[in-house]
Amino acid sequence: MPRATLWQRLTGAGFARFQAGDLIGVLPQGSAVPRLYSLASGRRDGFVEIVVRKHPGGLASGQLTALEPGARVTAFLRRNPGCHADRGRTPLILIGAGTGIGPLAGFIRGNARHRPVHLFFGMRHADSDFFYGEEMPGWQAEGRLTRLVTAVSRGARRSYPPHWRI
């Protein structure tokens, strides 16, 4: 992504057009094969955000999780219209697990119109896999997230998606 001024970052100007759910193709060093990740942010956020699970021996995930602030990667954006929340007012039910929370978090963050959004999120371990867990109470207080239901498959209090009530 090209460098953007502070004003461009605050207003979302100076970035290519993209939204949560679009894809970013990352070309890891040592490979010509891009790895596609769903974006957890939109242009108006002023940053590009993805959720990455580090795979043991994984080339791209290993490089991405080792990045320091200000580091650069070779990447491209690809629209993914099949993974966009429409602009309607009908309630939105989001279901995801693990790193699949990325675009869903982007939809919630971008819900400035306070559309009813219900998130059902599954994870293995609540202490390490509850991505965006610190932000969710704020999203609920702001009216961006109506309901949060979680399932944790490992640990002391296990629960599984079949036990969810929608």
Language-model region placement:
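FNR-like FAD-binding dehydrogenase module
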Residues: 1-166
